[in-house]
């Protein structure tokens, strides 16, 4: 288990709790949280945050000794120590926060995962799979590193083949060229 990242995740979430700032774990750590176990080494920590509270997240990162390092078309990157944070906003949509363009329910209010004994909010299985569809548009799956192939397999197995195919069809119809 990568105790450095686990410790940092716990620190980030504790600081966010003090500010009543909801954060969702995304990417590979979301898969691990939903499964309740660490499945691999992670290159970064993906976080989803309320878009209108970005300044609070940035201040919190600075308070934890970090800094924003790069602006991206979907959010920003930050570093705390040697750890990379990949931060993406979610926006309030009637009853819940949602990631833009992701399937509804992308940011569940409840803590639906666990990282080293701590309950955590994490992106939905559907949002995780949706991200892999974007990734497949950028990099053919045959060229994916083994860790991404395995994480995608775990996510698909957890969601179920039928639901994955429904999502894939929705993705294709939305982004058909």
Curated annotation (Swiss-Prot):
Instruction: Name it.
Output: 2''-aminoglycoside nucleotidyltransferase
InterPro entries registered for this protein in UniProt: Aminoglyc_AdlTrfase
Top EC class per UniProt? transferase
Give the binding site residues for Mg(2+) 2.
44, 46, 86
Q: Where is the active site?
A: 86
Q: Which domain of life is it from?
A: Bacteria
The record ties this protein, via Pfam families, to: Aminoglyc_resit
- Which example biological process does GO assign this protein? response to antibiotic
Binding-site list for Mg(2+) 1: 44, 46
- Any one GO molecular-function label of the UniProt entry: aminoglycoside 2''-nucleotidyltransferase activity
What is the source species?
A: Klebsiella pneumoniae
| The encoding gene | aadB
Its recorded reaction(s) are:
nucleoside triphosphate + gentamicin = diphosphate + 2''-nucleotidylgentamicin
Q: What is the lineage of its organism?
A: Bacteria, Pseudomonadati, Pseudomonadota, Gammaproteobacteria, Enterobacterales
